[in-house]
A protein has these predicted regions:
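Long, amphipathic, Lys/Arg-enriched alpha-helical "connector/arm" segment
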Residues: 41-47, 92-134
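Short, polar N-cap/turn motifs at the start of nucleic acid-interacting alpha helices
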Residues: 158-165, 235-236, 255-277, 298
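Catalytic-site neighborhood detector that most strongly recognizes the C-terminal catalytic loop/helix
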Residues: 168-173, 265-295
Length: 298
């Protein structure tokens, strides 16, 4: 995504690394502050929206360029042998702005229970199932499947028994473990799971049959969630609230420690990168933690 933004900035597909200077990076940062947000990130057909780019992107994209620049210097320079093919150090003068903390988007345990208890809207003849019903169901599924993202619901293709295995779309290209996650289908959501299971077996869920791409699927979810938000009195309820709520309730109500919550969210702790190579990941401890969260509800 950062590279795509850089290509839009320079208006060409190639860039000599010597052109990346502190002045260049400041110009790129200023460009990001005025560039609109783009949709279609996961489908390769990104198009501009009428929304401004968030502060997180303005910090994150330059940090990605810095990482690439540093890796290139490690690859092509050898100071011990006097080989310095990339002499510039633009990030000594250009300081990447710190990534702002994500605003908490958790709803209360009572509001989550309200969503679970909401009655479905009736079908409209010839109009298919209301997006209200879809949004309610997938929000609950996400909450119960460790905050699974909509792009992963759309993309997941591996299931064995009651275990879904997927590589998180958002981060799989940035991690050595492909951001692999294994989630267990709890009894409470078995009927919902069966409702949306892919009858062809090509993927885990049938959402890809209903919607052209993951972005359209996510958009429809958020349309339905706006109506649900009005009922439970949450302004601008969005799909990501499910993930935040799962994590918050796990820690605050179910007594799951913060380290385990981080694992439930499939985050990667850079300080444990070496340990990850030697220690096989045990997903069952995450399922046990998730069981504690499920037991908070009727």
């Amino acid at each position: 995504i950062a590279i795509n933004a850089l290509v839009r900035f320079i208006k060409k597909d190639t860039l000599d690394i010597g052109e990346i200077t502190a002045s260049f990076m400041r110009s790129f940062e200023n460009y990001l502050k005025t560039e609109p947000s783009y949709k279609g990130r996961y489908t390769g057909g990104a198009v501009a929206t009428d929304k401004p780019k968030g502060k997180r992107a303005v910090s994150l994209y330059p940090s990605r360029i810095r990482t690439i620049h540093n890796l290139a210097k490690l690859e092509y320079n050898d100071e011990d042998l006097g080989i310095v093919r990339i002499p510039l150090s633009p990030f000594a003068k250009f300081k990447v702005a710190p990534i702002p903390k994500t605003k908490h988007r958790a709803i209360t345990i009572e509001q989550m229970q309200q969503i679970i208890d909401l009655p479905y809207k009736e079908y409209v003849r010839g109009g298919g199932e209301p997006v209200f019903n879809l949004a309610k169901d997938v929000f609950i599924l996400s909450f119960a499947l460790l905050g699974m993202n909509s792009a992963d619901f759309y993309d997941a293709s591996v299931i064995s028994g009651n275990i879904v295995t997927y590589q998180r779309v958002k981060t799989r290209t940035r991690r050595d473990d492909m951001a692999e996650m294994k989630v267990r289908i709890e009894p409470e959501i078995k009927k919902l799971f069966d409702k949306y299971a892919d009858p062809t077996g090509e993927r885990v869920f049938s959402f890809y049959c209903r919607y052209k791409n993951a972005d359209i699927f996510n958009k429809m979810l958020n349309i339905g969630l706006k109506d649900i938000g009005k009922i439970i009195e949450v302004d601008n309820l969005q799909y990501y609230h499910a993930r935040h709520t799962m994590a918050t309730l796990a820690n605050n109500k179910a007594g799951v420690d913060m380290y385990r919550v981080d694992e439930m969210l499939n985050h990667s702790d850079s300080s444990l990168k070496l340990a990850r190579i030697y220690v096989e990941r045990d997903f069952s401890v995450l399922w046990e933690a998730n069981r504690k969260v499920m037991d908070l509800f009727n």
